[in-house]
Amino acid sequence: MADLFAILVVAILVVFSFDFFNGFHDAANAIATIVATKVLTPTKAVAMAAAGNFVGMVFITNAIAETIGKGIIDTNVLGVNALPLSDAALFHSLAIIMGGVVGAIAWDIITWLWGLPTSSSHALIGGLIGASALAAGTGSILLPSTTNMLLFLFVTGMAFVLGAASYFAYDVIIRRHRPTLGMTILAGLLTGLLPAVILGKILLKGLVQIVVYMVAAPLVGLAFAFGLALVVIRLFRRHTPTKVNHEFKRLQLVSSFFYSVTHGTNDAQKGMGIITLILVVAAIGPPWGPPSGQFAVPFWVILGAHASISLGTFFGGWRIVRTMSQRVTHLRPWQGFSAETGGGIALASSALAGIPVSTTHVIASAIMGVGATKRLSAVRWGVARRIFWAWIITIPASAGVGMAAYAIMRLAFGV
């Protein structure tokens, strides 16, 4: 059986590598809009985004790290209820955790090579679910009760129907237009958004809660960006386009940095949660680990995770920047400001609530929301559909890769 200390060191380095790939793959989204508006060159934008990711560690909350560490799979599968573990049990627990992380990294690399703006966050969740399900069955995946699930579906479903029907009636009776199916569905989704966000936090948990917020977070980003863009249009309607662009070029520097900070605090916490879980399972206490019985992230883990994601941002992601900034919609500085501010608000809210969401989804939807203020045809929906299908397959595909990675880890660890 392999040396325990060496395995722990390698496991922690692998998680930091995940954060690096997260930055390489996901954090480019933070600069997509500021590159599209030509406020900054790609090189300067990447440097600013990397700095913002690192500054994200001052956002004092570890709620997402706790959700990742103990809110997706049953930690009893990892032996948390029977510490300290024997070497064999510890190696098996590490095989599950590392299977999930390695599966997520593999999926990140695959989608980066394809140029798809998929989600590292959901790849990690899928990898953990796949590894845990293969190791201990689907019962190891945390799910809400049937009663809570049905209540959630009933309330949000009624809100969706009410919103869609109201929009349909408004378009037919008041505007005397023929309503489009897409806008009718979108109206229903936006109406159901508030009850979904509130009830999702109260009634749901585990995988179902994450899937709900996987849909809700982009809609929040879209709604905030769309609304903010409409406010900007209203306030600056008497100004010349040249003056508006000049003013918002400076403001977009602030909004882009704000988005980078919220991205850093949101995404770095995924790696922080995994490393803290490793320390808990290995029964490593202070100063390197959390106190017994607590899920407290050590400062060195916070520092290392943010440094890793910042370095990843600095070194890559250009193909995805091109997809996000040039092929979704064309942007002006005021639109970039609206998209980044709306997306940043959505990410900051999710960080405070402890909900792991996809920064990729949020900024893509925010860009589409801003583009839709001009006209729906201004958004290149073909690219949006491609991104949408990439979202849909991320969790199941990365779960499959996580299963394979777990099997390989068991062989490597000799358990």
Named regions from a protein language model:
Residues 1-415:
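Multi-pass alpha-helical transmembrane bundle typical of ion/small-solute transporters
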